[in-house]
Design a protein with these regions (language model features):
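Domain-level signature for proteins that mediate thiol-based redox and metal-cofactor handling
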Residues: 1-191
Length: 191
């Protein structure tokens, strides 16, 4: 029998939010899904997040595709906790432990509406990749056709990031209002 074990690599990337760090794997750990656990009490659906919250320096966990974004506790220093988190994540994934128990996929209500379809396409094509690159996620929540307001939810490193309001207003709102004339404003549930 040939042993085809692939080398697992985990490295850390800074995010625009100084309280979060993105830990990236060279393989997918949660393909096409995103799970956000901003507090320990919400982590029961993810054995990985639950295990990470056992560390006193972990204040939040966001898991998506090939990365885990950790929000540190006040007083924790990245240079002290980074090696611990990297070693833990590598061992956890190499042991093939479950990442999450969730398998439920929900669809966006009203996605058959042409304006909402345009908004979703722009989010998926232009905005989500940039936000994911920074260790976060943006999710469409709703579009009010009367007021022209798009509501989104920001997760991961975007939640609580000092620059997320600027990104939301100048970047996301600017792009959507230019590309979809019916959009007048973009607001976030979590800001």
């Amino acid at each position: 029998m040939t042993d085809k074990t692939e080398f697992l690599n985990v490295y850390a990337e800074q995010t625009p939010n100084p309280e979060t760090m993105k830990f990236v794997f060279n393989k997918m750990i949660l393909p096409d899904e995103a799970e956000d656990y901003p507090i320990k009490e919400k982590a029961n659906a993810s054995p990985l997040a639950k295990s990470l919250f056992e560390f006193s320096f972990v204040n939040g966990v966001f898991i998506m595709n090939n990365f885990v974004t950790i929000t540190r506790s006040v007083g924790s220093e990245w240079h002290e906790i980074m090696p611990i988190v990297k070693e833990f994540l590598k061992a956890y994934v190499e042991a093939d432990e479950p990442i999450t128990y969730k398998t439920d996929k929900s669809s966006v209500e009203g996605s058959d509406n042409i304006i909402i379809a345009q908004i979703l396409d722009i989010l998926d094509t232009y905005i989500k990749p940039a936000v994911e690159n920074d260790g976060g996620l943006i999710s469409f929540k709703s579009f009010n056709e009367v007021s022209g307001v798009v509501t989104v939810e920001l997760k991961g490193s975007c939640s609580g990031c000092p620059s997320s309001t600027v990104t939301l207003k100048r970047g996301i709102e600017g792009l959507l209002t230019r590309m979809v004339p019916q959009v007048k404003e973009v607001v976030a549930e979590s800001l």
